[in-house]
Amino acid sequence: MEAKGGTVKAASGFNATEDAQTLRKAMKGLGTDEDAIIGILAYRNTAQRQEIRSAYKSTIGRDLIEDLKSELSSNFEQVILGLMTPTVLYDVQELRRAMKGAGTDEGCLIEILASRTPEEIRRINQTYQQQYGRSLEEDICSDTSFMFQRVLVSLSAAGRDEGNYLDDALMKQDAQELYEAGEKRWGTDEVKFLSILCSRNRNHLLHVFDEYKRISQKDIEQSIKSETSGSFEDALLAIVKCMRSKPSYFAERLYKSMKGLGTDDNTLIRVMVSRAEIDMLDIRASFKRLYGKSLYSFIKGDTSGDYRKVLLVLCGGDD
């Protein structure tokens, strides 16, 4: 399948100073023109939004982020501030939010660390250290435990082979070792699962999954479900899903954030904001294929007001 890409593109005829003036006007005086804010920020890409922020400061003498914070609230504010945050910094802030205070948002940690490329994870590590004066790994270790901690540390080390090379003998050996680490024995050698799933390249792993099915008569996902549990299981499944298809993985994250009663707004916002420029069109196609309904219709039915408006713009259309 040819990748379709994102819904948010660079605006043509872009003028940062004009945009800055429009935003100021939308927030000056009584009330706020939310439509004007959406009309600009949801229709510019990340780089352009940074230029608008600079222009706002140099021509108006105020900080755009501070103004947005004082004018907006709740989920709508969270989306707009997310759009205003440079990509890597956004991931870093989400990882920090997932670990700060009581409780841990395991789903967020898994989603970011399992889906980003090694290069992105290296940048996340650098930025995390700059922002908080300690390493991402330190925070993971103080906030999580056991095998779940180990898989997150392994993913955060960005040690995955980035090549495309396939060594047939090693591929067969990996499949056999996974089989022997789980299905074939009583108990599970969890470290074996971790080391293979966190270090091999995507092409290699896809072949390992096929070979695994051939020798065990089971999908690797089925084995992970029966052999592991809790957040460790969730992390391994996320790695496998991201290797098979990132758009399908994110479609599932979105579906789960909205199905049933209530909405997991943090997940909905994070996926919509972080994937809008990358693969939102592919996510939409996967969503429709997997769930028989469009992502657009799900968002429309699950959200309201300006929050709904801005998410639908990021979604980019109905299917």
UniProtKB/Swiss-Prot annotation:
Cellular component terms (Gene Ontology): apical plasma membrane; cell surface; collagen-containing extracellular matrix; nuclear membrane; perinuclear region of cytoplasm; zymogen granule membrane
Places the protein is found: Zymogen granule membrane
UniProt topology in membrane: Peripheral membrane protein
Record key words, sorted: Acetylation, Annexin, Calcium, Calcium/phospholipid-binding, Cytoplasmic vesicle, Membrane, Phosphoprotein, Repeat
Pfam families documented for this protein: Annexin
Entry keyword Lipoprotein: no
Positions carrying Phosphoserine: 12
GO biological process: epithelial cell differentiation; kidney development; negative regulation of interleukin-8 production; Notch signaling pathway; regulation of transcription by RNA polymerase II
SMART domains according to UniProt: ANX
Residue positions where N6-acetyllysine is found in the record: 213, 293, 300
PROSITE patterns: ANNEXIN_1, ANNEXIN_2
Chain positions found as Phosphothreonine: 7
InterPro entries (UniProt xref): Annexin, Annexin_repeat, Annexin_repeat_CS, Annexin_sf, ANX4
Annexin repeats: 14-85, 86-157, 169-241, 245-316
Gene Ontology molecular function, alphabetical: calcium ion binding; calcium-dependent phospholipid binding; calcium-dependent protein binding; identical protein binding; NF-kappaB binding
Lineage top rank: taxon: Eukaryota
Keyword field contains Cytoplasm: no
Coarse class of the protein's main subcellular location: membrane
Other notes: Seems to bind one calcium ion with high affinity.
Domains as described in the record: A pair of annexin repeats may form one binding site for calcium and phospholipid.
Physiological role: Calcium/phospholipid-binding protein which promotes membrane fusion and is involved in exocytosis.
PANTHER family, per database record: ANNEXIN, ANNEXIN A4
UniProt family annotation: Belongs to the annexin family.
The protein, known as: Annexin A4
UniProt organism field: Mus musculus (Mouse)
Species classification: Eukaryota, Metazoa, Chordata, Craniata, Vertebrata
